């Protein structure tokens, strides 16, 4: 332990966000650079806690105290080696992960936790700048081939692990570019896409073959995949959005979040798309249904498009400001948080149920809603409408960001005959193999809507299962 008293000497400090009046006029990442000397002090706050519960909070099992100590000692090259041993893509998690590791930090019991996420971000960015992140092609090829369906974080993690183990890996993606949700679902102000592209270049140099623009199940069937490859990993994500079943849903001006975010990401990438006035928030009254990260992504995008006003409505009650007895340490607390998008403007309101939508000439004009109360009935929280609280809100653009229900049914899932669970997710065993021998699955397609860090962990675990299936044993690491 480099600085046993660091947590007593230094307060928690994180990077500042760029001024709101500046950043809402561009699509660049929102955080300012963090001075190296201040980061060393933040790493020094990692205490000699004996049992590092941050491990339990990290799905990929990052050895966090080790690389905190190495950063404090300025041993950056060793730090990135330790970090890459458990996490293929720390540049993604360092930007996009909600950091459940910090929620489990022992220091966080009675103090502010260590800035684990920021240290992770600085390690990987320093490594890229120093030229330490290089392709790691295998020394020996196995002669086995694997098809990975889906190029989100789960599919990419699985592909990289398998390629490094010596297998020939082909990643299929139905979109025109590789990256899945990272490419078209995450706004640039959270992660600029050159961050993704440089990692894909590394993977190509390691032998991974990318095939964008191929819709597996349509352009190539499940049977064709099985005939051409020795194993398959299904990592297509949970892409079926939760819909709003109310009168007026079919009015122009109502869109799923991904229908709204994807075109803007494509324009930021330089694509020339036909202009759709209904999908442009400029000068519009916007309502977002859903209070999660996707809703915040829509909020930040609407700000940058020049929305007149934005409301974000949530069905659930407003979260508490700090942990309650129902959220004991080291669990991840569901508390009230202010994202960069919320800092930029807009109104959040809670306990609101949409009853219907109305419009003129087929175009959305108003949202009609009622306020709710949540009551305990036999140990269950049940919502009740509050009489007399009905209201209507003028709206030009309504965005549905209410989560995802699971993978899209039919298609390659039916063609391969994999078994689904009660929620419609692909069932798998401990090795991530489905009910069909040689067909594996990873990420949101099997666990349901979740975090990027869980997708990476799932992809690594699936790669381990596939390697064992193909070779009889595996040297790939187990994911915690």
How should each PLM-predicted stretch be described?
Residues 4-20, 29, 43, 47, ...:
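Short Fe-S-cluster ligation motifs
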Residues 5-32, 61-73, 78-83, 87, ...:
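Beta1-alpha1 glycine-rich phosphate/pyrophosphate-binding loop at the start
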Residues 44-66, 89-110:
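Local cysteine-cluster metal-coordination motifs and their immediate loop/turn environment
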Residues 123-140, 198-218, 241-305, 420-435:
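Glycine-rich dinucleotide-binding loop and its adjacent helix/turn
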Residues 140, 145-149, 197-246, 355-377, ...:
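Feature captures the FAD/FMN-dependent oxidoreductase FAD-binding
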Residues 146-148, 169, 286, 439:
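Conserved hydrophobic helix-helix packing surfaces used for dimerization/oligomerization
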Residues 250-283, 363, 375-449:
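FAD-site-proximal beta/loop scaffold in flavoenzymes
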Residues 295-300, 305, 445-476:
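A conserved FAD-binding loop/helix module that cradles the flavin
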């Amino acid at each position: 332990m480099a600085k046993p008293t660091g947590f007593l000497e230094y307060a928690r400090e994180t990077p500042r966000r760029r001024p709101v009046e500046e950043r809402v006029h561009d699509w660049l990442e929102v955080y300012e650079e963090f001075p190296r000397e201040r980061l060393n002090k933040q790493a020094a706050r990692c205490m000699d806690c004996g049992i590092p519960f941050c491990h339990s909070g990290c799905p990929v099992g990052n050895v966090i105290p080790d690389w905190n100590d190495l950063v404090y000692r300025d041993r950056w090259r060793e730090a990135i080696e330790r970090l890459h041993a458990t996490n293929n893509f720390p540049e993604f998690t360092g930007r996009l992960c909600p950091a459940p590791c910090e929620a489990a930090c022992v220091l966080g019991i009675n103090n502010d936790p260590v800035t684990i996420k920021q240290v992770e971000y600085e390690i990987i960015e320093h490594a890229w700048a120093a030229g330490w992140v290089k392709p790691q092609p295998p020394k020996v090829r196995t002669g086995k081939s694997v098809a990975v369906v889906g190029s989100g974080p789960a599919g990419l993690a699985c592909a990289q692990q398998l390629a490094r183990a010596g297998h020939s890996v082909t990643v299929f993606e139905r979109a025109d570019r590789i990256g899945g949700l990272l490419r078209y679902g995450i706004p640039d102000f959270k992660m600029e896409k050159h961050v993704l592209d440089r990692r894909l270049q590394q993977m190509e140099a390691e032998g991974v073959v990318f095939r964008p623009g191929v819709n597996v199940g349509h352009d190539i069937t499940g049977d064709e995949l099985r005939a051409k490859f020795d194993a398959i990993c299904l990592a297509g994500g949970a892409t079926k959005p939760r819909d709003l079943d109310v009168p007026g849903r079919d009015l122009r001006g109502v869109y799923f979040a991904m229908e709204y975010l994807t075109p803007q990401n494509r324009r930021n990438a330089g694509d020339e798309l036909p202009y759709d006035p209904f999908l442009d928030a400029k000068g519009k009254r916007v309502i977002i249904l859903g209070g999660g990260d996707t809703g915040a992504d829509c909020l930040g995008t609407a700000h940058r498009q020049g929305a007149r006003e934005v409301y974000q409505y949530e069905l659930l009650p407003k979260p508490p400001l700090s942990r309650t007895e129902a959220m004991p340490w080291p669990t991840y607390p569901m508390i009230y948080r202010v994202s960069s998008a919320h800092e930029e403007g807009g109104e959040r309101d809670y306990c609101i149920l949409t009853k219907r939508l109305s419009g003129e000439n087929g175009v959305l004009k108003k949202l009609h809603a009622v306020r709710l109360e949540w009551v305990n009935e036999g140990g269950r929280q049940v919502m009740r409408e509050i009489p007399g609280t009905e209201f209507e809100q003028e709206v030009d653009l309504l965005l549905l960001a209410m989560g995802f229900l699971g993978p899209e049914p039919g298609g390659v899932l039916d063609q391969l005959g994999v078994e689904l669970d009660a929620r419609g997710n692909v069932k798998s065993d401990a090795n991530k193999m489905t009910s069909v021998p040689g067909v594996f699955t990873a990420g949101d397609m099997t666990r349901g809507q979740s975090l990027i860090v869980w997708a990476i962990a799932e992809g690594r675990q699936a790669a381990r299962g596939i390697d064992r299936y193909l070779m009889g044993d595996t040297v790939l690491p187990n994911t915690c």
